[in-house]
From Swiss-Prot:
Sites of Phosphothreonine modification: 570, 590
Underlying gene: CTTNBP2NL
Name of the protein this chain belongs to: CTTNBP2 N-terminal-like protein
Low complexity: bias regions: 405-430, 467-477, 587-600
Ranges of Polar residues composition bias in the record: 511-529
Coiled coil segments of this chain: 87-285
Subunit structure: Interacts with CTTN/cortactin; this interaction may redistribute CTTN to stress fibers. May form homomers. Associates with the core of STRIPAK complexes composed of PP2A catalytic and scaffolding subunits, the striatins (PP2A regulatory subunits), the striatin-associated proteins MOB4, STRIP1 and STRIP2, PDCD10 and members of the STE20 kinases, such as STK24 and STK26.
Modified residues (Phosphoserine): 284-285, 481, 488, 523, 527, 560, 563, 568, 592
Length: 639
């Protein structure tokens, strides 16, 4: 610690420490003195009692005796020496006090001299004070004169004040008149203000009414805005659906172009085959060909198909019409047809091509029309069976030359029949739309309104969306079946459902084999869910108008309430591919929840559907014309 450079708080702490040490030392000294005081008094005055005169005399005697002896040392100190010391100190104090007294006397003398000087100075001041009084008298006279002047000035000011007061009185009277006039004007103004207040109240009431009307108009405007947003959302939804339709139509156009190319190649090959057959059968006559036995081939799903074309259900059929016209040309030439080659039906999602099948029925029906009665014709039409997913798609017949050319109605296409066929074969079709479309096709087969076209296109877009979502879910779960069998969205069959389906198939086969009576035609109102409007529409339409759309006896859907039992055709997964991208919508619009909700089926529904699927896939019906008669063959196929 540097003692030369200490701050003030450090010095204070140091001084307090030193002071504490000094106080401690004094306390220690006092304690030691208190301890030795009793011993000191005992040593010095222990022998004598000061209050007893006898003891005092004895003490003095002893002291004198000691002086006389001189040999003995007193035990305690001699009090005479102490008294001498005290006397010396008193003398010193006396001398000191005398010196102080002399100093006080000298100071007193100085004070007296100062007082004398002050007295002389005061005398001089009094002498000078006479002159001051004279000057003060002169000053007083001057001030009196000034006072007189001020008094005269005050009088003048008073006169002026009187004049001003009179003027003020006049001004006051004038102001009173003005104030009375202002009061009258103020009353008038208050009356006007009251009137204006009443007017303002009326205007405020009008304003409230206007505000209420404006609020109502704002509410209406908000409602209109909501309607506008809803319509905008609907328009956006329609635009997205139209974009999806456009992409689908582009894909369909590409598929149609590829299909036309393949059909042209097939047509060229068929022309070559026909030319070869004409060259080989030049020497044979048509009568000999009719007497030859009919060859019936029972095709199963394992046999290779000669002519197989798979396309979407929503596609049009320009290539099929070409193919049908080629068949009509071949039959119109009157040349003999081959006995062994067979025309295989092109499948539309698991169903036979309606145009080729209708052409076959027309060529066979025109030849056998004179031999078969009308009742047998209706029975044969009612006995036509559809080809399901796992069934045999090939129907084989003996081509017979047709004496008369085909009418144009056999290959005509109407948009209403296309819409009705697509709606009736769809799992999402509704009976009301089916009834309307079939009614319109029955009334005017060649015409379809733009509203029905829009409904048809929108329905196909929605169905494509749902099927693509279902296929993506099945691909993600690893449950995808082969494309030759998976032509409709079905659930996976378990072993119990398959066993039950096989049992039902055997029962149905035994029932069909044991049945020998004539088969009655199906009534148009035989649907378990009420009137089957598709049968009514097909009975109302001529046969030529329904050549494009499959008949109700051939194509039906187990999921639709109008015709249960047979699975609806869907788009093949091999040709469908990935769905077109959905265009982005506005951020304020939310997608409809129906587009993202997957279709679910309960276990009982799945069991019933798998039973119907196994029944339809294990049995295939082929109608063969042999010697002018319709032969119905029910053939079990390999599952």
């Amino acid at each position: 610690m540097n003692l030369e450079k200490l701050s003030k708080p450090e010095l204070l702490t140091l001084f307090s420490i030193l002071e504490g040490e000094l106080e401690a030392r004094d306390l220690v000294i006092e304690a030691l003195k208190a301890q030795h005081r009793d011993t000191f008094i005992e040593e010095r005055y222990g022998k004598y009692n000061i209050s007893d005169p006898l003891m005092a005399l004895q003490r003095d005697f002893e002291t004198l005796k000691e002086k006389n002896d001189g040999e003995k040392q007193p035990v305690c100190t001699n009090p005479l020496s102490i008294l001498k010391v005290v006397m010396k100190q008193c003398k010193n104090m006396q001398e000191r006090m005398l010196s102080q007294l002399a100093a006080a006397e000298s100071r007193h003398r100085k004070v007296i001299l100062d007082l004398e000087e002050e007295r002389q100075r005061h005398a001089q001041d009094t002498a000078e004070g006479d002159d001051v009084t004279y000057m003060l008298e002169k000053e007083r006279e001057r001030l009196t004169q000034q006072l007189e002047f001020e008094k005269s000035q005050v009088k003048k000011f008073e006169k002026e004040q009187k004049k001003l007061s009179s003027q003020l009185e006049e001004e006051r009277s004038r102001h009173k008149q003005l104030s009375s006039m202002l009061v009258l004007e103020c009353k008038k103004a208050t009356n006007k203000a009251a009137e204006e207040g009443q007017k303002a109240g009326e205007l405020s009431l009008k304003l409230e009414k206007e505000k209420s009307r404006v609020s109502k108009l704002e509410e209406e405007l908000a409602a209109e805005r909501k309607r506008g947003l809803q319509t905008e959302a609907q328009v956006e939804k329609q635009l997205s659906e139209f974009d999806i339709e456009r992409e689908q139509l582009r894909a369909k156009l590409n598929r149609e172009e590829n299909r036309t190319k393949t059909l042209k190649e097939e047509m060229e090959s068929l022309k070559k085959i026909v030319k070869d057959l004409e060259a080989s059968h030049q020497h044979s006559s048509p009568n000999e060909q009719l007497k030859k036995p009919v060859t019936v081939s029972k095709g199963t799903a394992t046999e290779p198909l000669m002519l197989m074309s798979v396309f979407c259900q929503t596609e049009s059929f320009p290539a099929e019409r070409t193919h049908g016209s080629n068949i009509a040309k071949m039959t119109n030439t009157g040349l003999p047809g081959p006995a062994t080659p067979a025309y295989s039906y092109a499948k539309t999602n698991g169903h036979c091509d309606p145009e080729i099948q209708t052409t076959r029925e027309l060529t066979a029906g025109n030849n056998v029309e004179n031999q078969v009665p009308p009742r047998e014709k209706s029975v044969a039409l009612a006995q036509e069976k559809p080809v399901e997913n796992g069934g045999c798609p090939v129907g084989i017949e003996t081509p017979v030359p047709m004496p008369s050319p085909l009418s144009s109605s056999g290959s005509s296409l109407s948009p209403s029949s296309t819409a009705s066929s697509s709606l009736t074969s769809s799992p999402c079709s509704s009976p009301v739309l089916t009834k309307r479309l079939l009614g319109s096709s029955a009334s005017s087969p060649g015409y379809q309104s733009s509203y029905q076209v829009g409904i048809n296109q929108r329905f196909h877009a929605a169905r494509h969306k749902f099927q693509s979502q279902a296929d993506q879910d099945q691909q993600a779960s690893g449950l995808q079946s082969p494309p030759s069998r998976d032509l409709s969205p079905t659930l996976i069959d378990n072993s119990a459902a398959k066993q039950l389906a096989r049992n039902t198939v055997t029962q149905v086969l035994s029932r069909f084999t044991s049945q020998q009576g004539p088969i009655k035609p199906v009534s148009p109102n035989s649907s378990p869910f009420g009137t089957d409007y598709r049968n009514l529409a097909n009975t109302a339409n001529p046969r030529g108008d329904t050549s494009h759309s499959p008949t109700p006896g051939k194509v039906s859907s187990p999921l639709s309430p109008l015709s249960p039992g047979i699975k609806s055709p869907t788009i093949p997964r091999a040709e469908r591919g990935n769905p077109p991208p959905i265009p982005p919508k506005k951020p304020g619009l939310t997608p409809s929840p129906s587009a993202t909700t997957p279709l679910t089926k309960t276990h009982s529904q799945a069991a019933s559907l798998t039973t119907a699927e196994d029944l339809a896939s294990s049995c295939s019906s082929n109608t063969v014309v042999a010697n002018g008669k319709d032969v119905e063959l029910l053939l079990p196929t390999s599952s």
